[in-house]
C-alpha cells in the first residue's frame, strides 16, 4: 500500500483484560512489520443497566440490578505495508473481542 493510507481498528469487549491483551498483540504485530501506530486510544466505556424483578409474581419493590460494561479501544495503523496487512489477517485474537476494521485511502482526512 502506497501513499497516505491508514487502517482504523475498533475493538470492543466486556472484559478489559482480554481487550488490552488483544490490543497489545495488534500493536506488536504492526510494529514488527514496520508500520506506525497511533493509539491505542481508550474510548468511553458504555454501561448498560438492567433492573429485574426478583419475584416471579408479586413484590414490585424487591428488584435485582445488573450492569454490563462494554470497553472500547481505537487503533490507527498509518501507512501500512502489504506485510502488515498479511500479518494482521493471520492474527488469532481471543474469543469475546469484537474487531471492526476500516481502511482509508488518500482522499480521507
UniProtKB/Swiss-Prot annotation:
It comes from the Bacteria. Involved in the binding of tRNA to the ribosomes. The keyword Methyltransferase does not apply. The keyword Methyltransferase does not apply. Gene3D superfamilies: Ribosomal protein S10 domain (3.30.70.600). Signal peptide: none annotated. GO terms for biological process: translation. The gene is rpsJ. InterPro entries: Ribosomal_uS10 (IPR001848), Ribosomal_uS10_CS (IPR018268), Ribosomal_uS10_dom (IPR027486), Ribosomal_uS10_dom_sf (IPR036838). This is Small ribosomal subunit protein uS10. Keywords: Ribonucleoprotein, Ribosomal protein. Belongs to the universal ribosomal protein uS10 family. GO terms for cellular component: ribonucleoprotein complex; ribosome. One of its GO terms (molecular function) is tRNA binding. HAMAP family: Ribosomal_uS10 (MF_00508). Part of the 30S ribosomal subunit. Pfam families: Ribosomal_S10.
